[in-house]
Amino acid sequence: MTCAHSTTGAPSKPTSAPCKLFRKALQSCYVRAMTQELTTSLPTEPVRPSESPGWWRDAVIYQVYVRSFADSDGDGIGDLRGVRERLPHLAGLGVDAVWLTPFYASPQADGGYDVADYRTVDPLFGTLGDADDLVRTAHELGLRVIVDVVPNHSSDQHPWFREALADRPGGAARTRYHFRRGRGVHGELPPNDWESVFGGPAWTRTTDPDGTPGEWYLHLFAPEQPDLNWDSSEVRAEFDSVLRFWLDLGVDGFRIDVAHGMVKAAGLPDIGRTEQAKLIGSQVLPFFDQDGVHEIHRSWRRLLDSYPGDRIGVAEAWAPTSERLALYVRPDELHQAFNFQFLKCPWDAAAMRQVIDESLAATGSVGAPTTWVLSNHDVVRHTTRYADGGPGRGLARARAAALLTLALPGSSYLYQGEELGLPEVTDLPDELRQDPAFFRTSADGQDGQDGQDGFRDGCRVPLPWTRSGDSYGFGPGGSWLPQPDAWSGLSVEAQTGDPGSTLELYRGALALRRELPGLGDGPMSWLQAPAGVLALSRPGLVCTLNTLAEEVELPVPGRALLSSAPLSYGAGTVRIPPDSCAWWAI
């Protein structure tokens, strides 16, 4: 089949005739009733997806940013019950697993990545029973569940940190974190020159019980996120226990937040320059990508392997080279590591090919799959990144990039809403923003061009499910961030059944990926192609990508299976539109 290019314009408003409103209400009630019937009839004993050793090597995994996915109770914030009710959408999309962002007890200083209790569900998102129900429902639908674990830092409201603040300098409670005396005559200066990823110093000074200034503590992110000290045996034992807690509940693995950051260089040496966030991912730093993290990951691999069902660990690791990143996925370490080199790659055929070659060579050298990703909750959505000043161009390129990544060997991660072609929301009012980096960078006057720029809220706007309603079906009430009016036409309801829509393009691609044995993990070779064009061969399939601003004419590679834009043919040739990708059966 061939999918036509979809448009981003919102359709005309549905009529307000009472019969149509009644019909929509009836459909909504029916969908909810069917979902409830499905999920309440599950067996009481845990069910796991069919055993498939190495399932993760070519899995397509969908990231759910929980607070923005679906709201079940009308408070404007997504929750676990909302995710559970929408799992049939993900099963129908054709993904293999779901990754959930943190839903643990948290003051929400950084969207839940500041954890106060790693074994408790925050009431904002539901209960432990809701988490258990979600895992059971996902497994019944054939979906695996990966949850976030945040080991680099805790919340400043974690009992351990409260104990540390109450303890004396050098006390046992403080050894779980990084407390240091300041520099200067009176300790008035930070212990070193490290900067927070969110802007400003990476150190905050404490106040002793008698009111005098005390030691400083390290936080590579917000002050509300003190870094844990992984030299502490207590810290290591605690996280082993946390992992076992969630594995016992039935989760299939963990996405490890800041997997490159738990170990700091001995002595906490100065870096010697400012704007350190710009160095992340370009060189080894005293606080990131230290070799000592690998021993921790090896111990976690042993723990994961002690459970049945191929449970996995996924590294969020910023490394300067593909070779450094591959160290995280050696056979005795983690299973996957996000390929941020590919995410950062410009829309250029030569640059893409270089990153693909380097990535496949590096992971292949350790026997691991490459893990491709285009967007996540920390970066500008790729529909907007690729736009280069033209929203239509951005969507065309995003659709093409999706087909390219799904044709490459290895695993692929999708960020919620990319299957709808959602763009970044760039006009959120400052008073509604919640990203802590926004407040830090604004206060410090930083330009935010690298690292986390303080505008991550724009990729976290709640999803549109229906054409109408206060929050386009996100929940019974409003949404914690406002959705653009144009998102009516980008909703799941608006795109379902439209053969030219981005949603149906993703559904078609994922269905073919399951059907074609040559896709996923396995060999790949490059075919000859003109400048600006990529042509790659997989067993039984050819993928062509045109990154140019004009169409190119090629010999017909095979039988057209799927394309991100309409194709046209000559005598034995095909004209590939600009910024488009196509799959061909051979």
Residue ranges and their predicted role:
Residues 98, 254-256:
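Hydrophobic residues within beta-strands of alpha/beta enzymes
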Residues 5-6, 11-13:
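Intrinsic low-complexity, disordered N-terminal segments enriched in polar/charged/small residues
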Residues 36-42, 55-57, 272-285, 295-310, ...:
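Loop/helix patches that line or flank the sugar-binding groove of alpha-linked glycan CAZymes
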Residues 571-586:
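C-terminal beta-strand-rich structural cap/linker in extracellular carbohydrate-active enzymes
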Residues 35-244, 248, 261-320, 463, ...:
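Acidic/aromatic-lined carbohydrate-recognition and catalytic surfaces
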Residues 550-566:
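Beta-strand-rich binding/interaction modules
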